[in-house]
Amino acid sequence: MNGATIGSSEALVAALAGRRRYFASLGATATDHGVLEPYTAELAPEEAERLFQKARNGEATADDQRRYEAHMLMEMARLSTEDGLVMQLHPGSLRDHNSAVWQRFGPDKGADIPVATEFTRNLRPLLNKYGTDPRFSMVLFTLDESTYSRELAPLAGHYPALRLGPPWWFHDSIEGMRRYREQVSETAGIYNTAGFNDDTRAFCSIPARHDLARRMDANWIGGLVARHIIEMDEAREIAQAVTVDLVRETYRFPAMEA
């Protein structure tokens, strides 16, 4: 797409950097990475090149692929520190689970199933290198709700670069949103979340989804007021944050005109 010849791992990263610059020039502020697992590892340049050439020659094993993908996530994080694009990570979907559907109709026909996902160990190399870098910002999503309070909330509460994305896909629902707030907020707080964003291709559903998210957040905030955990002025401030301010801050959108 950019006319470059990609014959090496270094050339691949350079080509991706070029595409990132192109999208940024059109107003993009974030990248999005879909992986089966959020495994990260920093490889020596010669090892990354060896795995790249094995893949080009059709000789790469499943472990080779796993290690190279882990290295590329590290490279994408590095590029984010250079170009300022927010790094989004959507792990944990086993794509095309139904082999018969895949063979007849091809990929991405609705047979994508969540799998258990481990973040704490898998992201440690990336977060040790970039988690406290003020140039870096990462938004984490999950399909494994068991990780909300055990892993994601503590990670976001510790690393300044992390924000937790809203409930995603199967959990983008009334009960999914309720579970998210209950499991995340006590440890991660409110201001370590990304507010409610929307990456759906179902364009006409966007207003309804935002309406549902705002109603669910209002219900949750109202519950905090009813239990005398916060006051009304604090509730109004939180409502503004979760609906508008956190998203604009997370994705580095220009400030709104007064």
Question: What are the functions of these language-model segments?
Answer:
Residues 2-25, 70, 78-86, 226, ...:
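Extended recognition/assembly regions associated with phosphoester-bond processing machinery
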Residues 20-27, 127-131, 154-159, 184-189:
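Acidic (Asp/Glu)-rich catalytic clusters
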Residues 25-29, 83-85, 134-137, 160-163, ...:
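Short, well-ordered coil/turn segments that N-cap beta-strands
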Residues 29-147:
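Divalent metal-binding pocket/active-site signature
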Residues 41-43, 97-106, 148-156, 174-181, ...:
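Histidine/acidic-residue-rich catalytic or RNA/ligand-binding cores of hydrolases
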Residues 88-92, 139-143, 164-168, 190-209:
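Short acidic/histidine-rich active-site segments
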Residues 144-146, 164-182, 231-254:
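C-terminal helical cap
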Residues 190-191, 208-258:
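Mid-to-C-terminal alpha-helical segments outside catalytic/metal-binding sites
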